Design a protein with these regions (language model features):
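A small/polar (G/S/T-enriched), proline-flanked helix-loop surface module common
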Residues: 26-184
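Polybasic, low-complexity association/targeting segments
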Residues: 3, 23-25
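Bacterial N-terminal signal peptides that target proteins for export
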Residues: 1-11
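C-terminal motif of bacterial Sec signal peptides marking the signal peptidase cleavage site
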Residues: 18-22
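Core hydrophobic alpha-helical transmembrane segments of single-pass membrane proteins
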Residues: 13-17
Length: 184
């Protein structure tokens, strides 16, 4: 019996040590609280420095007023091609934005699967340049648009619309988590 008691005590000690080690390990910190509205978002500070590094984004530039947003250059979403990522915060409902886009010639808008309960639409409207956009519903009076496009004249390779949309699909959950909570 003595051997069995030692074995049980040893297992208990190892389990406790493992639990203590797990408790003291570097767990990721919880995400910062969501802003209550788009007015609280500073567009060029939307991504953390770690995210900018991960997404290979640089040179943030505010959009020209009256537009509220920021533009970054990058190359992660299509190897060897320079791209531009634009975040635009809009004081208008997604429905109104979609209606305006829908009236544009050749508009191709499709609803995507919801991201953490938030409605999202993809804009693949053809134009002179290759681009893909996502429109995020915030509430009945505001929305956000994220657009990824080729940075014209910078590289010899050209991404396809499919390449750019794939990059946005990768970013969508991260962007959703930084927007105000969905309100109905």
């Amino acid at each position: 019996m003595r051997g069995r008691e030692l074995l049980v005590a040893g297992i208990a000690l190892m389990t406790a040590c493992g639990a203590l080690t797990a408790c003291s390990s570097d767990e990721p910190s919880p995400p910062p609280p969501r802003p209550s509205g788009i007015a609280q978002i500073k567009p060029c500070d939307f991504f953390t420095q770690d995210e900018l590094d991960e997404y290979e984004l640089h040179d943030p530039a505010p959009l020209t007023p009256p537009a509220v947003g920021c533009m970054w250059q990058g190359s992660k979403f299509f190897e060897d091609a320079s791209t531009v990522l634009v975040l635009t915060l809009q004081d208008r409902a997604a429905d109104k934005e979609l209606a305006d886009l829908g009236s544009a010639s050749g508009a191709r808008i499709s609803e995507r699967p919801a991201v953490d309960g938030r409605r999202v639409w993809r804009d693949t409207t053809p134009g002179k340049d290759v681009k893909c956009g996502l429109i995020f519903e915030i509430d009945g009076s505001s929305s956000a648009e994220l657009e990824l496009s080729e940075f014209l004249g910078v590289s010899d390779v050209e991404p396809t619309q499919q390449d750019l949309c794939k990059g946005l699909d990768e970013l969508a959950p991260r962007v959703e988590g930084k927007l105000p909570a969905v309100r109905t």
